[in-house]
């Protein structure tokens, strides 16, 4: 994936793959079944021009659970491992299932589809009896960051997108958007399907991917040593968990002071995306530019205890931001959320 998008290396890569797969055609009389899979999709003509009898089963519902571990498989064939994980972390069995589901579940490769767990992360969690972000441990996805810049995609734009199958189950050789790369790399997955319009809803699969992805993107927005940054974020999360908003915002202010000077640093949008990333690292529900009848809320964050409405003002007072929240009555949109509403300017 690091080189598949480069004009110089793509023809070489394509030729190597063509030479590798071409002998299959000559071996046809001796082959009863051939299964091909990979991380990205090439146009069939560019690689498999001689193999004209392939069937792409990527989005066939009957094969929806073929690559991964379904929830049913985990609860039956891996029940002993779930119980062992629960005991090691002093959880009930139900709490362990909920933690595993939130962290590693959520993949769908067609619709309808069973819930699919990331097998690599799930098996690692069972091996050491700890729930952590294993999928990103191999390194930062530099190619993804480069593609996000190329297509001018903001962190908050990743996920919750509606698109046709032809726009994401498509070759990545000459992408017109970043959607095929996000889907085929596992950063977004199918979450819903609208049959009348044939539109699929794509979103980030689970907490592991959201937190790992945002952690990779954060250095592009702040100039802080990673160790110090992670420590500050952990302290912010603990303050939020303890309802100590004064401490959380003190830490947040300290964090924002690390933003280096750049062209984007003089725009509210830069800080909006930064807050989106930081709050996503908390593992919380967060949205930006949330529409209300009288305007848009810059950032909305939801926890188990409250709903936070953020209005951002650059080179203006916090009072001006709070005044706008009240003047445009942003809170009324969330009156039925069943949570206390906290306004932040």
Predicted region positions:
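Nucleic-acid nuclease catalytic cores
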Residues: 318, 322, 331-345
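A short acidic/basic microdomain associated with nuclease active sites
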Residues: 278-292
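Short beta-strand or tight-loop elements
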Residues: 293-297, 339
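Conserved catalytic cores of phosphodiester-cleaving nucleases, focusing on short active-site segments
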Residues: 275, 297-314, 328
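Phosphate-binding site recognition
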Residues: 1-267, 282
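Hydrophobic/aromatic beta-strand patches that form the interior of the parallel beta-sheet core
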Residues: 35, 308-310, 342-344
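Short, well-ordered amphipathic alpha-helices
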Residues: 17-22, 325-332
């Amino acid at each position: 994936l690091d080189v598949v998008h480069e004009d110089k290396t793509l023809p070489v890569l394509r030729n190597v793959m063509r030479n590798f797969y071409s002998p299959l055609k000559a071996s046809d009389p001796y082959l009863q079944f051939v299964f091909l899979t990979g991380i990205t999709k090439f146009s069939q003509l560019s690689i498999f021009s001689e193999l004209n009898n392939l069937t792409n089963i990527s989005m066939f519902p009957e094969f929806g659970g073929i690559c991964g571990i379904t929830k049913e498989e985990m609860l039956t064939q891996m029940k002993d491992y779930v119980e062992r994980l629960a005991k090691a972390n002093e959880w009930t069995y139900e709490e362990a299932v909920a933690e595993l589901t939130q962290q590693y579940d959520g993949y769908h490769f067609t619709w309808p589809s069973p819930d699919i767990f990331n097998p690599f992360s799930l098996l690692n969690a069972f091996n050491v009896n700890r729930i952590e972000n294993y999928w990103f441990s191999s390194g930062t996805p530099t190619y993804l960051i480069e593609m996000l810049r190329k297509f001018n995609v903001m962190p908050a734009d990743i996920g919750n997108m509606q698109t046709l199958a032809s726009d994401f189950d498509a070759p990545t050789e000459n992408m017109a958007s970043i959607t095929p790369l996000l889907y085929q790399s596992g950063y977004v997955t199918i979450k819903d399907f609208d049959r009348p319009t044939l539109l699929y809803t794509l979103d980030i699969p689970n907490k592991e991917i959201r937190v790992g992805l945002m952690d990779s993107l954060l250095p592009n927005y702040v100039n802080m040593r990673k160790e110090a940054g992670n420590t500050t974020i952990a302290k912010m999360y603990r303050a939020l968990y303890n309802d100590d908003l004064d401490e959380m915002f003190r830490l947040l202010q300290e964090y924002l002071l690390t933003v280096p000077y750049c062209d984007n640093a003089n725009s509210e949008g830069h800080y909006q995306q930064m807050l989106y990333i930081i709050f996503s690292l908390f593992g919380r529900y967060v949205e930006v530019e949330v529409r209300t009848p009288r305007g848009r809320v810059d950032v909305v964050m939801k926890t188990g205890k409250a709903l936070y409405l953020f209005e951002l003002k650059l080179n203006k007072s916090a009072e001006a931001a709070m005044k706008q929240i009240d003047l445009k009555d942003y809170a009324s949109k969330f009156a039925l959320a069943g949570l206390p509403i906290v306004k932040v300017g």
